[in-house]
Amino acid sequence: MIDITLPLTDIHRHLDGNIRAQTILDLGRQFNIALPAQTLETLIPHVQVTSTEPDLVSFLTKLDWGVKVLASLDACRRVAFENIEDAARNGLHYVELRFSPGYMAMAHQLPIAGVVEAVIDGVRDGCNTFGVEARLIGIMSRTFGEAACLQELDALLAHRENITALDLAGDELGFPGSLFLSHFNRARDAGWHITVHAGEAAGPESIWQAIRELGAERIGHGVKAVEDRALMDFLAQQRIGIESCLTSNIQTSTVASLADHPLKTFLEHGVLASLNTDDPAVQGVDIIHEYHVAAPAAGLSREQIRQAQINGLEIAFLSDSEKRALREKVAEA
């Protein structure tokens, strides 16, 4: 179902949600950190979703073991590098990796700005090694509150030339976007793009707020947009993209089943929706699974899957010339 004549992208992919189980095991041993299991086989149920979680917050607890072993900046650098290696193995030509430096720093009180620098270094080395093109999106973890998000923002702005966009993720219901208006004003002043997790746990009003108040150019997940036809019209007319993550939305119980997922409706409505993974290591999936298994199960036709692939590059945070160069590179391969 993947069109090999087109660039394959993943523009909603959490770097700190894609820490390999083997790496968790390795780092746990290296830093003498107690893990819930001592072999790869027995560790996987603790760090990977093996059945549907009751809600988003329950799903997010699966991520915690990955960051609990980040006891040094070198460990952060390693997982960033491995993220690019994984992208290359999946056949991705372009990936946007998003990460919350405060979340990665938290368990071992690492310097947040140091985490940002380590991630930048690891991704740069990975791109040079594996030939994948990547951009970084900084996340503010809303669950930690406004002050903690300000610390994350300051650390990201210290490396602003290496960061492409700002995102807001975490507990959407408990920490609405209205708490972070000044944060996003600073991000836009820095020339960054804006994407926001919205309409995943909260309703369409959260998406409207992300667009009108935070300046979102893309929406992460955005499944609740299907409940508001005027919103879908607006998204299509204004070319505001939706970063769809099919398997993730089932695993978090955001959507009951793939057959119920609104991605097909979005595409029929002319919304620029794309296919993405979200947290591949935690979910136990890759981008190939999303195209070959999840998308058909969600009712997408072959042409709709191709359109979602086209949309992935169309709404990527790249210039028109960069998109054109990527298309030409793939066409000539």
From Swiss-Prot:
<feature type="binding site">
    <location>
        <position position="279"/>
    </location>
    <ligand>
        <name>substrate</name>
    </ligand>
</feature>
<comment type="function">
    <text>Catalyzes the hydrolytic deamination of adenosine and 2-deoxyadenosine.</text>
</comment>
<dbReference type="InterPro" id="IPR006330">
    <property type="entry name" value="Ado/ade_deaminase"/>
</dbReference>
<dbReference type="GO" id="GO:0043103">
    <property type="term" value="P:hypoxanthine salvage"/>
</dbReference>
<feature type="binding site">
    <location>
        <position position="16"/>
    </location>
    <ligand>
        <name>substrate</name>
    </ligand>
</feature>
<keyword id="KW-0862">Zinc</keyword>
<dbReference type="GO" id="GO:0005829">
    <property type="term" value="C:cytosol"/>
</dbReference>
<dbReference type="GO" id="GO:0008270">
    <property type="term" value="F:zinc ion binding"/>
</dbReference>
<feature type="binding site">
    <location>
        <begin position="14"/>
        <end position="16"/>
    </location>
    <ligand>
        <name>pentostatin</name>
    </ligand>
</feature>
<comment type="similarity">
    <text>Belongs to the metallo-dependent hydrolases superfamily. Adenosine and AMP deaminases family. Adenosine deaminase subfamily.</text>
</comment>
<dbReference type="GO" id="GO:0009117">
    <property type="term" value="P:nucleotide metabolic process"/>
</dbReference>
<feature type="binding site">
    <location>
        <position position="170"/>
    </location>
    <ligand>
        <name>substrate</name>
    </ligand>
</feature>
<feature type="binding site">
    <location>
        <position position="14"/>
    </location>
    <ligand>
        <name>Zn(2+)</name>
    </ligand>
</feature>
<keyword id="KW-0378">Hydrolase</keyword>
<dbReference type="InterPro" id="IPR006650">
    <property type="entry name" value="A/AMP_deam_AS"/>
</dbReference>
<feature type="binding site">
    <location>
        <position position="221"/>
    </location>
    <ligand>
        <name>pentostatin</name>
    </ligand>
</feature>
<feature type="binding site">
    <location>
        <position position="170"/>
    </location>
    <ligand>
        <name>pentostatin</name>
    </ligand>
</feature>
<feature type="active site" description="Proton donor">
    <location>
        <position position="200"/>
    </location>
</feature>
<dbReference type="InterPro" id="IPR001365">
    <property type="entry name" value="A_deaminase_dom"/>
</dbReference>
<feature type="binding site">
    <location>
        <position position="12"/>
    </location>
    <ligand>
        <name>Zn(2+)</name>
    </ligand>
</feature>
<feature type="binding site">
    <location>
        <position position="141"/>
    </location>
    <ligand>
        <name>pentostatin</name>
    </ligand>
</feature>
<feature type="binding site">
    <location>
        <position position="14"/>
    </location>
    <ligand>
        <name>substrate</name>
    </ligand>
</feature>
<feature type="binding site">
    <location>
        <position position="278"/>
    </location>
    <ligand>
        <name>Zn(2+)</name>
    </ligand>
</feature>
<feature type="binding site">
    <location>
        <position position="200"/>
    </location>
    <ligand>
        <name>pentostatin</name>
    </ligand>
</feature>
<dbReference type="GO" id="GO:0046103">
    <property type="term" value="P:inosine biosynthetic process"/>
</dbReference>
<feature type="binding site">
    <location>
        <position position="197"/>
    </location>
    <ligand>
        <name>Zn(2+)</name>
    </ligand>
</feature>
<dbReference type="InterPro" id="IPR028893">
    <property type="entry name" value="A_deaminase"/>
</dbReference>
<keyword id="KW-0546">Nucleotide metabolism</keyword>
<feature type="binding site">
    <location>
        <position position="278"/>
    </location>
    <ligand>
        <name>pentostatin</name>
    </ligand>
</feature>
<dbReference type="GO" id="GO:0004000">
    <property type="term" value="F:adenosine deaminase activity"/>
</dbReference>
<dbReference type="GO" id="GO:0046936">
    <property type="term" value="F:2'-deoxyadenosine deaminase activity"/>
</dbReference>
<dbReference type="Pfam" id="PF00962">
    <property type="entry name" value="A_deaminase"/>
</dbReference>
<dbReference type="GO" id="GO:0006154">
    <property type="term" value="P:adenosine catabolic process"/>
</dbReference>
<keyword id="KW-0479">Metal-binding</keyword>
<dbReference type="GO" id="GO:0009168">
    <property type="term" value="P:purine ribonucleoside monophosphate biosynthetic process"/>
</dbReference>
<feature type="site" description="Important for catalytic activity">
    <location>
        <position position="221"/>
    </location>
</feature>
<dbReference type="InterPro" id="IPR032466">
    <property type="entry name" value="Metal_Hydrolase"/>
</dbReference>
<protein>
    <recommendedName>
        <fullName>Adenosine deaminase</fullName>
        <ecNumber>3.5.4.4</ecNumber>
    </recommendedName>
</protein>
